């Protein structure tokens, strides 16, 4: 780079002058007389002071350094207008050079203040070229502007202010640069080359920085997990406090109601003779809300098909709801009234009655199937052998014969009546254990069904098929009897009436119920996973029962049902007394059903979720966006971690979104007396014969 040439430049060493404390700057500035000023600067003056600092003693070749610093003191000549200065000749040329250099300096400062990476024209003038390190390098710059308050110079004053405001925006970075000699630079490069060669020969496996980052990431994950646990504990404590306050308020209300009513009613059906209830005719409409009933209701959801599900629910409407009853050809109708329209002398339905009513549809269905197959030449005769009678005992089929002439109870969900002419046409009723559906295996016009052979020899025994559910119902009846005996003893000791205390056992110890609910909920979740229960059933149950005091009986029934199913699976083979289709024939079959359900949920993700929601779901569930079959990966991770309640809650939320569950509260809690798993129903191509049947599944 060629050095800057200037005639008036001079270089003077001031070492000797500094020691003598006397030094004067030689006069290099040019001054001249103009119309505006008698002594006007006709050139810029720059004074550069360079200071070098080095050690007084020799410390070695590597440590012999010298610090060099420079300071520029610049006196800029003022700009002038030729029309006002009335300059000519030499004064005019000097003014032109001054204005040109000031214009170049203003351009450089304006572009530096903008902070852009555009080209900076330092070479437009010698002034900007000399001041380049001070303006945009590692230096600190201070500028003093001189203005004229005269009105005639207002434009020059405005330009000067603009120049000063731009100079304030210039950012510099003052730092010390290390200038190395050629020998020192060669030695430094040789050392660096040797270091790089050694690293290539012996590569470092992992740096300490990467290890430190991994440790920090692990700490962050642990802290996030602890925060989630603390939040869940806080929410749980708040829910416990609310339940406790609500239970105490309900208990006080029950005591006030019991003090007002002392009328006794005759013993109700299914209760010991010593147990009495208050006459409901003496209780007002508000007091009748205290009764907790278990009833079965009919829900027609198919739009044009007569599909019937067995369900249970609390009737909240004061109006009467009449339902047609009929079991495969029975044309008689029975009305089922809600609890507010029930006769005043009739007691509420007990749990024992409800469990008995659950058993009756299966018994009646089997009897009707047996009678229809005896009248048809195309079907095999379903009979009872002596060996079957010995296995089932003497109660179940005797009860079946007695129930033939007994009218249906008000809590029973009636099966839809079928046309009379359907008795003349027959085909085999096929219940698929894999899909929990009833399908017809005969011709297109066949509407009579029979059970599929449970064994390879083709013999079907109706009484042995119903012993499994009979044992389960008997077990639940025994549980209900113990529950009532305990309630009776406690209320006799306290002198209270049973009919006015709808929440037995739970209201007596409200503080223990939240802990008991958590324990039972965890056991139920683990049993769901062990028995391969439907994910939809888990979701409905988990979202519906939040730990209220009235949920205790449903939690107990679900726990008993799952324990019964687990014990059945633990025997290693399907028991001969299990209902065909009501229980999964083996753990392998249950696992296959669960796998098909996960595939169904994976297909629902494409329909229910948008692209952004699917990507968010993949990220949330730890599925790589670049992997294949991402939806199936998410579906396979649902309800897998039984110990993590947050995982269970997220799984239930996602499944509910995929199946279109808007408000879990719309589902009646009593429907969980039976199973709530969705059932696929076979459809007929001809709309005239589009009968569809449904049966509850206990798996």
UniProtKB/Swiss-Prot annotation:
Any coiled-coil regions, as ranges: 179-247
GO MF term (any one): ATP binding
Database matches in InterPro entries: Kinesin-like_fam, Kinesin_motor_dom, Kinesin_motor_dom_sf, NACK_C, P-loop_NTPase
Record has Cell membrane as a keyword: no
Biased composition (Low complexity): 264-275
Region (Disordered): 249-345
Any Pfam family matching the protein: DUF3490
Keywords (A to Z) from UniProt: Coiled coil, Microtubule, Motor protein
Annotated protein name in UniProt: Putative inactive kinesin-like protein KIN-7B
